[in-house]
């Protein structure tokens, strides 16, 4: 399928207009309260540093779609409470220019419509496989990408684009890479493949389960990366451009809540984990733990492909399971099991479990209509999310892999 065709169809279907989060669709609760939060916390230190040095920022969003990168960057709260007229770091008066570059004419048109009232915003059609757009412009402070937009490029194309960015950028500029991780539990069929191959992907998760037919869904090819492969490609681009680059952050995102965990396009079992975490974040829904206690046995035939990835997935899955077991024990008033879970967990996780136990046992302190929906469920989801965010450097075992790079000239 031509690279832009599905996106143009998605725009026409309304997926890229202004949406509210919810239980299903492109901007579900996991997107807003897990994935967006992960991106924002990852870029926040660099954003705070840039704003401390520069009056107005210049931003280039690569694979911008309809401009969601602008929404992400302008809704990052400060790391410490401060007295300010705005709750967010990057306000409109601190933006000199936001340039959104995308291959899809429909996306560019939608972006122009979405932000027609903002004079600092511009959108351009650009094929990133052919190189960096807007090179006639002064250097940008942030070269941004999100939600795996750069996985549309081959290894060679990403290296070429990176070298051009490094040449164009100024000292202190930040580059944000966001690509698909190859070792995600969503697609074990890709684990044995090479980064040099572009492999099948689809956005069939936007369809209702009964319409998720591999024979009728629109497929296109993308590049799936490991953490080491991405860093090496960035370093090769730095060498090719004669630019020193510093990797600031390398993180996996959505390890167990990736979009395709709840589909069968790339694996034999359909889980309901993302849907259940959507319920946890939904403050109007009294959920349960069904679907949260996961079996990853379907990965057994693939685990030997990478011992490091296998260990990372096992450790994260073990911590995830400890949270859910503790929650189930609390609901059964099984205090012995709660105590056992806390005492057998690593220190940081034990503190989270103590917090959840305290909340559950003090529900009467919270004057809300539904304690589970309003307080307990969202806190459980945040603990699961924070477990992921506190993991070591990314290996490529999430739906997405994000890497922040600083230019040193």
PLM-predicted stretches and their roles:
Residues 1-57, 68-72, 175-203:
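Conserved class I S-adenosyl-L-methionine
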Residues 134-143:
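A short acidic, Gly/Pro-enriched loop at the edge of an enzyme's catalytic core
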Residues 159-171:
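A short glycine-rich, Lys/Arg-flanked "PGG" loop and its adjoining helix->strand segment in the class I
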Residues 63:
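Conserved S-adenosyl-L-methionine
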Residues 257-409:
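C-terminal lobe and adjacent flexible extensions of AdoMet/dcAdoMet transferase-like proteins
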Residues 67-130:
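Class I SAM-dependent methyltransferase SAM/SAH-binding core
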Residues 219-241:
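Short alpha-helix
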């Amino acid at each position: 399928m031509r690279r832009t065709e599905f996106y143009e169809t998605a725009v026409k279907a309304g997926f890229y207009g202004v949406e509210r989060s919810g239980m299903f669709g492109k901007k579900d609760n996991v997107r807003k309260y897990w994935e967006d939060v992960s991106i924002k916390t990852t870029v926040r230190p660099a954003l705070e540093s840039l704003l401390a040095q520069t009056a107005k920022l210049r931003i280039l969003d690569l694979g911008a779609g309809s401009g969601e990168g602008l929404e992400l960057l302008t809704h990052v709260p400060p790391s410490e409470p401060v007295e300010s007229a705005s709750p967010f770091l990057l306000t409109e008066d601190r933006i000199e220019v936001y340039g959104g570059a995308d291959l899809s004419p429909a996306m560019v048109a939608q972006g122009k419509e979405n932000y027609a009232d903002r004079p600092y915003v511009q959108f351009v059609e650009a094929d990133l496989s052919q190189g960096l757009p807007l090179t006639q412009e002064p250097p940008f402070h942030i070269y941004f990408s999100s939600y795996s937009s750069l996985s549309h490029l081959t290894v060679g194309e990403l290296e070429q684009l990176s070298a051009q960015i490094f040449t164009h950028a100024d000292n202190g500029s930040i580059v944000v890479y966001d690509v698909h991780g190859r070792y995600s539990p969503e697609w074990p069929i890709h684990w044995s493949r090479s980064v040099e191959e572009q492999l099948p992907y689809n956005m069939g998760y936007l369809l209702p389960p009964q319409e998720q037919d591999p024979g009728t869904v629109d497929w296109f090819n993308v590049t799936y990366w490991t953490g080491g492969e991405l860093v090496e490609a960035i370093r090769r681009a730095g060498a090719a451009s004669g630019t020193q680059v510093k990797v600031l952050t390398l993180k996996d995102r959505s390890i167990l809540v990736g979009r395709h965990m709840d589909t069968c396009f790339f694996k034999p079992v359909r889980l309901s984990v993302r849907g259940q975490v959507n319920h946890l974040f939904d403050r109007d829904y009294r959920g349960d733990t069904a679907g949260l206690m996961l079996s990853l046995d379907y990965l057994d035939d693939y685990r030997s492909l990478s011992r490091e990835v296998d260990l990372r997935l096992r450790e994260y899955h073990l911590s995830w399971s400890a949270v859910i077991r503790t929650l189930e024990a609390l609901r059964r008033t099984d205090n012995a099991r709660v105590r056992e879970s806390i005492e057998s967990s690593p220190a940081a996780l034990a503190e989270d479990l103590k917090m959840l136990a305290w909340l559950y046992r003090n529900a009467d302190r919270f004057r809300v209509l539904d304690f589970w929906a309003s307080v307990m469920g969202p806190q459980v989801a945040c603990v699961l999310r924070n477990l992921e965010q506190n993991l070591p450097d990314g290996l490529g075992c999430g739906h997405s892999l994000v890497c922040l790079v600083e230019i040193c000239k």
